[in-house]
From Swiss-Prot:
SUPFAM superfamilies: S-adenosyl-L-methionine-dependent methyltransferases. Its main location: cytoplasm. This is Ribosomal RNA small subunit methyltransferase A. Specifically dimethylates two adjacent adenosines (A1518 and A1519) in the loop of a conserved hairpin near the 3'-end of 16S rRNA in the 30S particle. May play a critical role in biogenesis of 30S subunits. HAMAP family: 16SrRNA_methyltr_A (MF_00607). Keywords: Cytoplasm, Methyltransferase, RNA-binding, rRNA processing, S-adenosyl-L-methionine, Transferase. The gene is rsmA. Its EC number is 2.1.1.182. Pfam families: RrnaAD. It comes from the Bacteria. Gene3D superfamilies: Ribosomal RNA adenine dimethylase-like, domain 2, Vaccinia Virus protein VP39.
Length: 278
């Protein structure tokens, strides 16, 4: 990568700028430029796309995205210590990198980017799930074409989980309702500085133009929240109080009242949401 952008290896970058990952910000720096380039390639053809990156840190993935031909990258970094390193990346790729020192949860990113837009990020562990939920809960089709995101491996497995498994829950339902998510890369702890205690995984989400099954998003969100907040209870108990005769509504949706949330596929929850919406 250094031969492409003329910048030094990332270990030299963090040493020169005195950078160290802050656990309270959910940071773990990925310093292998071969891996960051691979993640950028897994995002697909970037040549005609704007790219949103959250938590770029010292800019390893940022460099990969630019080298893979991203039209423009908006990198949102909360940690001001990383800004000088990112400024060096911006100087190496004139006019193609905008660095925003902000909290990604508070930025209207769609207003700052030009479609088509792809989101590619090694998400900070402490906000990754919240950001994903927001991106999946927006008006559909959303402002983005695809998501290529790194999570703790446990979270990635929850995203792709199937009914009947311990990992299956609301995150799987929301992800699989509107996208086709796949784990495309697993990384060991020693790929990062400092090494986290767990493995990480990259998930690529291909958006669907329409949800797999019709359902009102707000009703579906409420039903799944109630069902999985008490996942070991029978649905007739966990959903009690939702409507006067929940057992009848469950049966009309093709669900036995004695079943539990983890047994019900996406299609079943969507059918239940439609019955409740009337």
């Amino acid at each position: 990568m250094a031969s492409i952008d003329g910048l030094p290896p990332l270990r030299e970058v963090i040493r020169a700028h005195g950078l160290s990952a802050k656990r309270q910000l959910g940071q773990n720096f990925l310093l292998d430029l071969n891996l960051t380039a691979k993640i950028a390639r897994l995002a697909g053809d970037l040549t005609n796309s704007d790219v949103l990156e959250v938590g770029p840190g010292p800019g390893g993935l940022t460099r990969g995205l630019l080298a893979e031909g991203a039209r423009r990258v908006l990198a949102i970094e909360k940690d001001a210590r990383c800004l000088p390193a990112l400024a060096e990346v911006a100087a190496a790729w004139p006019g193609r990198l905008e660095v925003l020192n902000a909290d990604a949860l508070e930025v209207d990113v769609a207003a700052r980017l030009t479609p088509p837009i792809r989101i590619v990020a090694n998400l900070p562990y402490n906000v990754g799930t919240e950001l994903l939920t927001r991106w999946l809960s927006s008006d559909w089709p959303p402002f983005w074409e695809s998501l290529t995101l790194m999570f703790q491996k446990e979270v990635a497995e929850r995203i792709v989980a199937k009914p009947g498994s311990k990992a299956y829950g609301r995150l799987a339902l929301l992800s699989q309702w509107r996208t086709d998510p796949k784990i495309v890369l697993t990384l060991p702890p020693d790929a990062f500085t400092p090494p986290p205690s767990i493995h990480s995984a990259v998930v690529h989400f291909t958006r669907l133009e329409a949800p797999r099954h019709p359902a009102d998003p707000k009703v579906l969100a409420r039903v799944t929240a109630m069902a999985f907040n008490q996942r070991r209870k029978m649905l007739r108990s966990s959903l009690k109080g939702l409507v006067p005769d929940i057992e009848t509504v469950l049966r009309e949706a093709g669900i036995e009242p004695t079943q539990r949330a983890e047994e019900i596929p996406l299609e079943g929850f969507c059918a239940l949401a439609r019955r409740l919406a009337g």
